[in-house]
């Protein structure tokens, strides 16, 4: 079974996000939620727009705003 470059990119992005967030243990809960939302939004935007840069950045922006507002 062959792994497509899109799936490989998504896996690398998810692993990088998880590793980078673990290094930020002194962040406030709101900061963590914002970063997680931005990462999830970027991943979702990239998948939905077939890797479009604009879709990835838009997803990250929307996800970051949603993550920031969660639990307010």
From Swiss-Prot:
Q: Any keyword Iron-sulfur?
A: no
User: What is the first-listed, main subcellular location in coarse terms?
Assistant: membrane
Cellular component annotations (GO), alphabetically ordered: outer membrane; plasma membrane
UniProt keywords, alphabetically: Cell membrane, Lipoprotein, Membrane, Palmitate, Signal
Q: Where is the signal peptide?
A: 1-23
- Induction context: By elevated osmotic pressure in the growth medium.
State its location(s): Cell membrane
**At the top level of its lineage, which domain of life is listed?**
Bacteria
GO annotation terms (biological process): response to osmotic stress
- Residue positions of covalent lipid attachment, annotated as N-palmitoyl cysteine: 24
In the bilayer, the protein is annotated as: Lipid-anchor
Pfam (any one): Rick_17kDa_Anti
Where does the record place the S-diacylglycerol cysteine lipid attachment?
Answer: 24
Role: Provides resistance to osmotic stress. May be important for stationary-phase survival.
Q: Which NCBIfam families match?
A: PRK10540.1
What is the name of the protein in this document?
Answer: Osmotically-inducible lipoprotein B
Q: Which organism is it from?
A: Escherichia coli (strain K12)
Lineage from the top down? Bacteria, Pseudomonadati, Pseudomonadota, Gammaproteobacteria, Enterobacterales
């Amino acid at each position: 079974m062959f792994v497509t470059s899109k799936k490989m990119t998504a896996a690398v992005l998810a692993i990088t996000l998880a590793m980078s967030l673990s290094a930020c243990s002194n962040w406030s809960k709101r900061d963590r939620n914002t970063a997680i939302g931005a990462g999830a939004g970027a991943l979702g935007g990239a998948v939905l727009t077939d890797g479009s840069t604009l879709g990835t950045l838009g997803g990250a922006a929307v996800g970051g705003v949603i993550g920031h507002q969660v639990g307010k």
